[in-house]
Amino acid sequence: MSSISKRLSLRVSADVIYRGLTDTRLERLFPEFFTGITRKLTSSNKANSELQFTTTTYDSQIQIKEIFKLKVLESNATEIIYTTSTNIANDPVVESIVYMHIANILYALLMLETGYVNGLMERQK
């Protein structure tokens, strides 16, 4: 499978996104949802605002490599360039898994923005 790249702008600071991406509380609190899946931070370059994860499933049969590049835009806004690739090509089942994984990551980032913006609005009241 060739790499898939998505670009997303959020009204959240890069630091909040960085902490959200590296947070592992869900894996620790609900391990039953992560059976057979290992997600490791394989590279972190905070100076260049880049994170790289490797997600391995089912005895390393499927490996998903993810790179997040964070670029600070105007005040409190960040652009995320999210690139995904896998070790298996031309397999519709694996492609389906990867597309669902990408959708979940993008949804989680949008929910991070929603929670962040709502929290700011609550503070201003």
What are these regions (language model features)?
Residues T38-S43, T55-T57, I64-V72, T84:
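Hydrophobic/aromatic beta-strand elements that line small-molecule binding cavities or substrate pockets
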Residues F34-G36, F68, A89:
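Mature, Sec-exported extracytoplasmic domains of Gram-positive
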Residues R11-D15, S43-N48, K69-E79:
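A short, structured loop/turn motif at beta-sheet edges
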Residues M1-R7, V16, E50, Q63-K65, ...:
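Intrinsic-disorder/low-complexity, polar/charged segments enriched in Ser/Thr/Lys/Arg/Asp/Glu/Gln
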Residues T84-K125:
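A conserved amphipathic terminal alpha-helix motif
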Residues S44-T54, T114, N118:
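Short, hydrophobic/aromatic-rich segments at coil-to-beta transitions
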Residues S13, Y58-S60, L73-S75, S85-A89:
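Short coil/turn motifs at secondary-structure junctions
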Residues M1-T38:
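Hydrophobic ligand-binding cavity/cleft-lining segments
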